[in-house]
Amino acid sequence: MALNLKIGDIVQNKYRIEKLINRGGMNSYLFLASNLHVQEFGPLQKRQFTRLVLKVVQRTDKINDNNWKKFLDGTITTTRVSHKNLVQTFDVVSPRLSVLSENQVIVLEDTVMIVMEYVDGPSLREMLNQKGYFSVQEVVYYFTKLVKVINYLHSFEHQIIHRDLKPENILFTSNLTDIKLLDFGIASAVIRNAEKTEVLTDENSLFGTVSYMTPEVLESTVNKEGKRIRKPPTVQYDIYSLGVILFEMLVGRVPFNKSIDPKKERETIQKARNFDVPLMGNLRSDVPVSLENIVFKCTAVKRENSKWMYSDTKQLLADLAQWQTEQTLIKPVHERILEGQNEMRELMVSNYLPWYLRKGVLIFFSVVLLALLIAVVSFFIITGVVVHS
């Protein structure tokens, strides 16, 4: 039966659905739920366990047996980690769920439920919508915490790559003194050794959030059967996303404009291959060069820039520790190619600009050039007449 949990439904005779929080990758849903067995806990635990978040993932037809098993293994791996800046996981239920809905018991097969702590604070997205951007000191404080928890995930033998880092998945505690990282709905658990790289989650689908996705997600390779598949994810997936988040925390927007046409997601993702990240100092005067360089090194996926890109989060943390030192730009302004520099050319060839507007622009420039030509010719004729007389 398809996943269709509603407000008031009781899952596993234990959790009452309060509301749908969000929908994520791999047919996953986040629900806020109340714990019906909270009386089993002591007074100090009741506050933590009264309200919980349920992450429910149901298998789809696109996921074969092997990939579903890999996903389950990867889920178990990701839920065994513990860090003060990770949303805590209390339980995992699979492969089926029992749901009491409108006095009828429904069993959901091939379904996983992850029971997580509820963080009673705003998301980074909500804070950005409210504040616009953060002070430099606030950014360094919160961003360092975020990088440290990503470094922790990357340090496992079963290397955990989050793959969907974005402001919506970063939560603040209620007093705004700390952050919690949420949502491993599309995380990849990767085993790396000398012989091979094995990915424990399905890599054939393009998962993530476009504005925070590195162009590397589009790269593919050919397997032993001659089938083209996506390359295994690397830590640079998360590092690129971190750079975009740092940029957004400082200036309130992402580095590259999202394509108007939702069908052109790949075009948006590829922009980091074609353009350099804009200088934040042009948008805000107090951004230090050190943070400009950190953003640049996180997002340096252009071929000529790749030599500067971080190979791991340890390098990023080392640079963050030195953010107050005087620095010069790694790549000078005059060597950077920015998205807006080709704006007029893009407008002229854009499918979004109606033909009559494109024609109007061409006519305008033709008239201007003709007027300039007439002016120059007239000047020489008049000058020639005066000199001759």
Curated annotation (Swiss-Prot):
EC number: 2.7.11.1
Superkingdom classification of source: Bacteria
GO molecular function, one term: protein serine kinase activity
Residues at the catalytic site: D164
Catalysed conversion reaction: L-seryl-[protein] + ATP = O-phospho-L-seryl-[protein] + ADP + H(+); L-threonyl-[protein] + ATP = O-phospho-L-threonyl-[protein] + ADP + H(+)
Keyword rRNA processing (UniProt): no
Keywords noted in UniProt: ATP-binding, Kinase, Nucleotide-binding, Serine/threonine-protein kinase, Transferase
Enzyme class: transferase
Domain Protein kinase: 15-356
Pfam families: Pkinase
UniProt entry tagged with the keyword Phosphoprotein: no
Similarity-based family: Belongs to the protein kinase superfamily. Ser/Thr protein kinase family.
Identification of the protein by name: Putative serine/threonine-protein kinase
